[in-house]
């Protein structure tokens, strides 16, 4: 019986991001019709954490919109982490808050954050094609600082944004340098609101990406996140035969995901168990 890790996302601030990431509907430049809000209440976040834990999630990720942390946002995330840790102590708390300083990351670590998620997204060479308002090097440095602060590292990216095979190889080589604890794979889903217009990946290509990622990062938990349901469809649970160790359950940031109950039912039927402790 294979044990897999489930992770849930909690979007605690959403929309109105001034960055121009071509794949992201939260960018104000995209003009996407999404729900926007500044800060969820502490109680709402705690309630979502309790539901995630009830649905067998081990990871619970506190996600903010925007390019980077500032002192106010850092204090907010730290307060959420303390509240969730008090009410649901067995959850592994992850923060995904953009670029950050070493000092800010230390504050999150001290508040009970276990892991920091900041994706490289793609290769250093291709990144300027999909984002011009900040650099790939800034992202890489945040990952280094997260490790230095004692946080476990969660970094991955998005496929199907027009990158070449050489870009994919370069991207995975950069991930390997960072030796992340976990690495999320997202598959791009086209939206009329986005300037990026790329055809969807085939299921075969998506599964090949999973295999190649696990081959490049054998000691890392490979997590399949955005696009799993739409790109893979009925073949989505084949990801585990191809090297995946974890999935995101429930909804994503601005997109609906599979119902957690359906994932749990299908995975249980296939003989999987769910990680309840992080090691």
From Swiss-Prot:
Catalyzes the conversion of dethiobiotin (DTB) to biotin by the insertion of a sulfur atom into dethiobiotin via a radical-based mechanism. InterPro entries: Aldolase_TIM (IPR013785), BATS_dom (IPR010722), Biotin_synth/BioAB (IPR002684), Biotin_synthase (IPR024177), Elp3/MiaA/NifB-like_rSAM (IPR006638), rSAM (IPR007197). One of its GO terms (molecular function) is 4 iron, 4 sulfur cluster binding. It comes from Campylobacter concisus (strain 13826). It is an enzyme of class 2 (transferase). This is Biotin synthase. Homodimer. The gene is bioB. [2Fe-2S] cluster binds at residues 61, 96, 154, 221. Binds 1 [4Fe-4S] cluster. The cluster is coordinated with 3 cysteines and an exchangeable S-adenosyl-L-methionine. It catalyses: (4R,5S)-dethiobiotin + (sulfur carrier)-SH + 2 reduced [2Fe-2S]-[ferredoxin] + 2 S-adenosyl-L-methionine = (sulfur carrier)-H + biotin + 2 5'-deoxyadenosine + 2 L-methionine + 2 oxidized [2Fe-2S]-[ferredoxin].
């Amino acid at each position: 019986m294979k044990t897999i890790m489930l992770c849930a996302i909690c979007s605690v601030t959403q929309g109105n991001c001034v960055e121009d990431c071509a794949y992201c509907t939260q960018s104000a430049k995209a003009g996407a019709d999404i729900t926007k809000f500044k800060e969820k209440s502490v109680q709402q976040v705690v309630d979502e954490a309790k539901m995630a834990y009830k649905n067998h999630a081990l990871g619970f990720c506190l996600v903010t919109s925007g390019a980077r942390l500032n002192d106010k946002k850092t204090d907010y995330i730290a307060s959420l982490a303390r509240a969730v840790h008090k009410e649901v102590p067995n959850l592994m708390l992850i923060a995904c808050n953009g670029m950050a300083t070493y000092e800010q990351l230390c504050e999150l670590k001290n508040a009970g954050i276990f892991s920091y998620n900041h994706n490289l997204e793609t290769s250093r060479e291709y990144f300027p094609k999909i984002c011009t308002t900040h650099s790939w090097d800034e992202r890489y440095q945040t990952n280094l600082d997260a490790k230095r602060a004692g946080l476990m590292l969660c970094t991955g990216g998005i496929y199907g944004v027009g990158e070449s095979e050489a870009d994919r190889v370069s991207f995975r080589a950069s991930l390997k340098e960072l030796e992340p604890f976990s690495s999320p794979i997202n598959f791009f889903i086209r939206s009329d609101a986005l300037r990026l217009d790329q055809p969807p990946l085939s299921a075969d290509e998506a599964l090949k990406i999973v295999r190649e990622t696990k081959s490049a990062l054998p000691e890392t938990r490979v997590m399949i996140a955005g696009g799993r349901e739409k790109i893979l469809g009925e073949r989505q649970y084949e990801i585990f035969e191809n090297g995946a160790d974890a999935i995101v359950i429930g909804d994503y940031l601005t997109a609906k995901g599979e119902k957690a109950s359906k994932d749990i039912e299908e995975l249980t039927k296939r003989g999987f168990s769910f990680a309840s402790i992080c090691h």
